[in-house]
From Swiss-Prot:
<dbReference type="Pfam" id="PF00149">
    <property type="entry name" value="Metallophos"/>
</dbReference>
<dbReference type="InterPro" id="IPR006186">
    <property type="entry name" value="Ser/Thr-sp_prot-phosphatase"/>
</dbReference>
<comment type="similarity">
    <text>Belongs to the PPP phosphatase family. PP-4 (PP-X) subfamily.</text>
</comment>
<dbReference type="GO" id="GO:0051321">
    <property type="term" value="P:meiotic cell cycle"/>
</dbReference>
<feature type="active site" description="Proton donor">
    <location>
        <position position="140"/>
    </location>
</feature>
<keyword id="KW-0378">Hydrolase</keyword>
<dbReference type="GO" id="GO:0051301">
    <property type="term" value="P:cell division"/>
</dbReference>
<dbReference type="GO" id="GO:0005634">
    <property type="term" value="C:nucleus"/>
</dbReference>
<feature type="binding site">
    <location>
        <position position="189"/>
    </location>
    <ligand>
        <name>Mn(2+) 2</name>
    </ligand>
</feature>
<feature type="compositionally biased region" description="Polar residues">
    <location>
        <begin position="7"/>
        <end position="27"/>
    </location>
</feature>
<keyword id="KW-0904">Protein phosphatase</keyword>
<dbReference type="InterPro" id="IPR004843">
    <property type="entry name" value="Calcineurin-like_PHP_ApaH"/>
</dbReference>
<feature type="region of interest" description="Disordered">
    <location>
        <begin position="1"/>
        <end position="28"/>
    </location>
</feature>
<keyword id="KW-0488">Methylation</keyword>
<comment type="function">
    <text>Protein phosphatase which plays an essential role in meiosis and in early embryonic mitosis. During spermatocyte meiosis and the first embryonic mitosis, regulates centrosome maturation, and thus spindle formation, by recruiting some of the components of the pericentriolar material (PCM). During oocyte meiosis I, regulates meiotic chromosome dynamics including synapsis-independent chromosome pairing, restriction of synapsis to homologous chromosomes, programmed DNA double-strand break initiation and crossover formation resulting in chiasma formation.</text>
</comment>
<feature type="binding site">
    <location>
        <position position="81"/>
    </location>
    <ligand>
        <name>Mn(2+) 1</name>
    </ligand>
</feature>
<protein>
    <recommendedName>
        <fullName>Serine/threonine-protein phosphatase 4 catalytic subunit 1</fullName>
        <ecNumber>3.1.3.16</ecNumber>
    </recommendedName>
</protein>
Length: 333
């Protein structure tokens, strides 16, 4: 969604140290803590360590269903898009892992300058604290999309080959498609599908594949709410659908949920309610693409599903590696 940026930072290969861990079954807590410590400094880990970490992440994600069942309390986060230093701001205001349980709604990569470090950090946290860090798939967790919008090129630039990109995109295929919190809050990256009436229909999708160009899996990752829309409309994105209050109400009633929480669209205020608070958009990339001027938000749900929004701004310029000059926006999605 919205404006994209040309990534001109760090155009030469970054220095990557020697691997510190072996096969995934030998990946120790100590190894993961070392990876997390390094990635929290926005430093790359060795290519072999990426391979091992991704293998471990796949093992964990493979045990999770298409619809993750999550208990409150939990903090819900929207798109990050490789804005590593803003992810650090998110953890400052939301609390560190494992003190806070997190659910990220996808779109970890593309457009920002640090998609590699961002995604690998989230994976390392997932591997270290699998019940505290929940990740679901966004439309940018896709081989095709990442070859266009920055992640593929970033992997080539930082590692000198496409191996890291291949390891990461294999993980994409294992990410869950949705989540449900306490049986009452349905979470998804994009939105609803005319092909899906019940969560059980999501549970039987074969998710371990590249995101299709159409169909229910595509719709979950690409659809958007549209005020005044009746039924289902064609999406200007070229994938997914526009859905209105009627479709949202029907889905909630059929599945016994009170709220549909999603990301996928830039919201200048960080979050936005739709359809009499049946649908909520959460956006967690402040000053999107280092030029949009928006704030970001996260949503904390307590043990009783009471909602508390936290608004935060982009990391100060002196704390980040992005150039001060606003990059040229050359495309929309």
């Amino acid at each position: 969604m919205a404006l994209a940026c040309t990534d001109s930072a760090n155009s030469t290969f970054s220095r990557v140290d020697s691997p510190t861990s072996g096969p995934s079954d030998q990946l120790t807590t100590h190894d993961l803590d070392r990876h997390i410590e390094k990635l929290m400094r926005c430093e790359l880990i060795a290519e072999q360590d990426v391979k091992t970490l991704c293998a471990k992440a796949r093992e964990i994600l493979a045990e999770e269903g298409n619809v993750q069942v999550i208990d409150s309390p939990v903090t819900i986060c929207g798109d990050i898009h490789g804005q590593f230093y803003d992810l650090m701001e998110l953890f400052k205001v939301g609390g560190p892992v494992p003190n806070t349980n997190y659910l990220f709604l996808g779109d970890f990569v593309d457009r920002g300058f640090y998609s590699v470090e961002t995604f690998l950090l989230l994976l390392a946290l997932k591997a270290r604290y699998p019940d505290r860090m929940m990740l679901i798939r966004g439309n940018h967790e896709s081989r095709q999309i990442t070859q266009v919008y920055g992640f593929y090129d970033e992997c080539l630039r930082k590692y000198g080959n496409a191996s890291v990109w291949k390891h990461c995109t294999e993980v994409f295929d294992y990410l869950s498609l949705a989540a449900v919190i306490d049986g009452k809050v349905f979470c998804v990256h994009g939105g609803l599908s005319p092909s899906i009436s019940t969560m059980d229909q999501i549970r039987v999708i074969d998710r371990k594949q590249e995101v299709p160009h159409d169909g229910p899996m595509c719709d979950l990752l690409w659809s958007d709410p549209e005020e005044g829309n009746v039924g289902w409309g064609l999406s200007p994105r070229g994938a997914g659908y526009l859905f209105g209050a009627d479709a949202s109400k029907t889905f909630c009633e059929t599945n016994g949920v009170d709220l549909i929480c999603r990301a996928h669209q830039l919201v200048m205020e960080g979050y936005k309610w739709h359809f009499n608070e049946k649908v909520l958009t959460v956006w967690s990339a402040p000053n999107y693409c280092y030029r949009c001027g928006n704030v970001a938000a996260i949503l904390e749900l307590d043990e009783n599903l009471n909602k508390e929004f936290t608004i935060f701004e982009a990391a100060p310029q002196e704390n980040r590696g992005a150039p001060a000059k606003k990059p040229h926006a050359d495309y929309f999605l």
